[in-house]
Design a protein with these regions (language model features):
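Active-site acidic/histidine clusters and adjacent loop/turn architecture
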Residues: 2-5, 10-15
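Conserved small-residue-rich
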Residues: 1, 122-127
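Exported/periplasmic cell-wall-interacting domains
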Residues: 14-122
């Protein structure tokens, strides 16, 4: 049960994001069970994304820092990828099976969850 705030850097085939603060980078490291951002792997992790308007959708992330960064004081060197159902990679424009498996895992985990006293209903089809 960890949560972090992210900055959306860019969108396209999938969403490129970065931790908003140094504390959020620490949380991301905890999610991956590592002590520093340089040790975070490309292993996919199922997540529940909650937007600023309260909309919740399941997604998958790989936390490995890569590419450009917008925020210089968050102790994170670059960005990481956030994938939704049927999102594609930038390089090959293909759906990543490992991200899709993590999303399905998130569905099975979240379909029986209550968060802040509210039963979460997970939709696997996004508008």
């Amino acid at each position: 049960n960890k949560s972090l705030n992210i900055h959306i850097q860019s969108t396209g085939n999938h969403i490129d994001v970065e931790p908003l603060t140094a504390a959020d980078t620490t949380t991301l490291c905890e999610i991956y069970g590592v002590g520093s951002q340089s040790s975070i792997s490309y292993k996919r992790r199922p997540m529940l994304l909650t937007t600023s308007k309260g909309v919740q959708v399941v997604c998958s992330i790989y936390g490995q820092p890569h590419g450009a960064e917008d925020i210089e004081n968050n102790n994170y060197d670059g960005q990481f990828g956030l994938h939704l159902l049927d999102s594609m990679t930038h390089g090959s424009s293909s759906v990543d099976a490992n991200h899709q498996a993590a999303i399905k895992s998130a569905v099975s985990i979240m379909s029986s969850k209550t968060i802040n006293g509210v039963q979460v209903t997970v939709k696997t089809v996004y508008p």
